[in-house]
Structures are given as structure tokens and as C-alpha cells.
Amino acid sequence: QAVESLVLRVRALSVWHATAAALTVAYTVWLAVRTTRDHFGLGTSAYDFGLYDQGIWLLAHGKAPFVTLMGRNLFGDHTSFILLPLVPLYWVVGSTGLLFVVQAIVLGLGALPVWKTAHMLLGSLPMSCVAVVAYLLHPALTYTGMENFHPDAALAPLIAWAIYAALAYRWGQYASAVVLILLVKEDTALFVIALGKIG
């Protein structure tokens, strides 16, 4: 039963689905390779990449995330609790390039709610693909991905997800997205208030 359902879903996919997926994967891989190469070529800096790397590394080793460069706790600067799920990854992958790979994947994931929103509003697979291309080619998205590492990068897919969920009346998903948005940074509460007008 589950296999038949999966086969039917795969058959329902079109060239537009495949194109959007391929472009998203290509963009994500390109961004991950480009940013890790820049990092290992000494193209990143202590602000802000080093702050997050040291803080997460300390948490992964059971220590308080006191960042020496700032002279205070990592979460004393911004309440970016969205970083906590990265701690177990530091147990497995010790490379500093991990943060750039995660950031590229997170930014790429935003293509999915963009696709779903466009398809829901326009009912057109080609236009949904165009929306994904517009998302991936947006200069702010690529700049965010290439300008060191920032937890704010998680806002791109989370905001897109929250907007989709609100427009689709999926309130459980909406609430989940809003909670995750609030975990990115303390000042996102202002955005969430505005987002409430949609919801």
C-alpha cells in the first residue's frame, strides 16, 4: 500500500517538478562548495563565523558558550537558540566547514514553500518553477549565504513556510514555523507580529 502510494506520487511529478528540484539541488551544492572553499581559503572572519563556531563547539563539549572574542556568552549577544540542533552535528563532524554546508542546505530548503505557495495561488506548474528560480536567484539570498555564517539565514525558509501555512490555513504548520522564527533571533518578534496579520 505504501509502495503503491509512493509510485503514484512519483508518476504525478512533472518536468517542472524535476527542473525545480534539480535547480535547487544545484544551487545548494554550488553555495556549499563555494562558501566552504572560501572559508578554507581564509576568506571568512571571526565576526561572525568564528563567534558561532566557537560557541557551538563549546556547547558540543559540555561547556558554557562563552565566546572569547566577544567576552560574553553566545546567547548574550542574540538569543539564537535555533543553533542548538547543530550541537550534535559537532559531535560527528568536527570540521568548521559544517556551518557553511548547513547554511546552504537551509537556504535551499526555502524553495519548497515558495513552490507550494506559488502553486496554491497560481495553479501553474511552470509559474511555480519560475517562482523557485526567482527565489534562488534573489541577490539577498546568495549574499546571505556567502557573507560568513549567520543564524538569520534560517529566516528565508521559515518565513516562506509560515506564509504558505497561513495562506493554506495549516495552523499547526504555521505555529511551528512561528516558534522556529522566534528561535532565530529576539528581534524576529516584530516580524511575527506583522505576520500575524496574514494568519
Feature roles, as predicted:
Residues 48-74, 81-82:
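Extracytosolic helix-loop segments that constitute the early lumenal/periplasmic catalytic or substrate-binding loops
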Residues 16-46:
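Transmembrane signal-anchor helices characteristic of membrane glycosylation enzymes that use polyprenol
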Residues 2-6, 10, 191-199:
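Perimembrane helix-loop-helix junctions
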Residues 22, 84, 92-112, 129-132:
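Loop-to-helix entry region of an early transmembrane alpha helix in multi-pass inner-membrane enzymes
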Residues 154, 160-173:
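Membrane-interface transmembrane helices that cradle and orient dolichyl/undecaprenyl
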Residues 105-137, 156-157, 172-176:
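Transmembrane-helix signature of polytopic, membrane-embedded enzymes
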